[in-house]
């Protein structure tokens, strides 16, 4: 009827269900709907929390299990605006630093439900601190020592000491903690839990100093390196949704064929592979 037009949001909202097979592929639609999380910007909350549920209920379609409104990225303390010229092009960041570090920063820095501030200074600080110093450097230390002292073969862990058991137990409980945080949309806290574990493993390496221990007790040093390597593998698996490309490189470097989140999947005797620095430090 040429006398009537469709409200643009009415037409747009329907795409959420038609895109996953509504009225076209029942099996596909049933596998996707109702969605667990409907993540939207806070500026379109009314559209998604009032109009959309009304449309679904009138059609007899189940509502999303939750609707979560995220905040805005600010440039410093101001909303990004072309007229102000304070817009950062994420593609430029990706060209300079890679997509995974950008993904990591955005998910680590934003508290979902609140606005977050972007500055190049905070991006570089987060990259160097978390990724270059903590995560990437741990892989470099472990792989270098194994290649130098164990013919690049993952050493046998042998019998665990108390400090080893602590790393193992923390690693085993990590996935359940992460699952709870993600279910509550606390992604930044979930990422920080993993990074805290990586920092704990770095301290474990410092306390045991396998670069010194290997000169006196090669078996004991091998145990330390196995524990640290397995903790790295587990951390990479948990971080893979955030940084799929870089964690894949790490897992390949460790010859880790298993992405299971249970402990002890590194296979002694497997040969480590050469790799480029995982996160070259930004000068």
Regions found by a protein language model. Name each.
Residues 87, 120, 171-176, 232:
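Residue-level signal for cytosolic alpha-helical hairpin/rod architecture
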Residues 132, 136, 168, 172, ...:
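Generic structural concept
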Residues 4, 122-133, 162-165, 181-188, ...:
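Short, solvent-exposed segments of well-ordered alpha helices
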Residues 20-22, 26-28, 139-178, 198, ...:
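Conserved, charged catalytic cores of large soluble enzymes
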Residues 92-93, 118-129, 149-160, 176-186:
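Short, charged, low-complexity loops and linkers
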Residues 180, 185-186, 195-283:
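Basic, alpha-helical terminal appendages of large translation-related enzymes
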Residues 71-73, 122-123, 157-162, 196, ...:
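A glycine-rich phosphate-binding loop feature that marks nucleotide/adenosyl-phosphate handling sites
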């Amino acid at each position: 009827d040429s006398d009537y037009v469709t409200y643009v949001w009415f037409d747009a909202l329907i795409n959420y269900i038609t895109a996953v097979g509504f009225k076209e592929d029942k099996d596909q639609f049933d596998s996707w709907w109702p969605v667990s999380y409907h993540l939207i910007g806070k500026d379109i909350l009314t559209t998604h929390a009032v109009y959309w549920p009304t449309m679904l209920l009138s059609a007899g379609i189940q509502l999303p299990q939750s609707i979560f409104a995220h905040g805005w990225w600010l440039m410093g303390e101001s909303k990004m605006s072309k007229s102000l010229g304070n817009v950062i092009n994420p593609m430029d960041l990706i060209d300079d630093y890679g997509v995974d570090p950008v993904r990591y920063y955005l998910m680590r820095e934003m508290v979902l439900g609140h606005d977050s501030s972007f500055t190049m200074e905070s991006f570089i600080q987060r990259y160097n601190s978390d990724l270059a110093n903590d995560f990437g450097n741990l892989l470099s230390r472990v792989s270098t020592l194994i290649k130098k002292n164990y013919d690049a073969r993952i050493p046998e862990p042998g019998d665990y000491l108390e400090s080893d058991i602590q790393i193992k137990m923390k690693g085993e409980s990590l996935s359940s903690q992460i699952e709870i945080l993600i279910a509550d949309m606390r992604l930044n806290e979930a990422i920080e839990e993993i990074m805290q574990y990586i920092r704990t493993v770095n301290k474990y390496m410092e306390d045991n100093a396998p670069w010194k221990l290997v000169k006196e007790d090669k078996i004991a040093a091998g145990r330390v390196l196995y524990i640290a390597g397995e903790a790295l593998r587990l951390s990479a698996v948990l971080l893979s949704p955030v940084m799929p490309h870089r964690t894949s490189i790490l897992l390949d470097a460790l010859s880790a064929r298993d992405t299971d989140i249970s402990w002890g999947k590194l296979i002694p005797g497997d040969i480590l592979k050469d790799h480029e620095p995982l996160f070259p430090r930004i000068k």
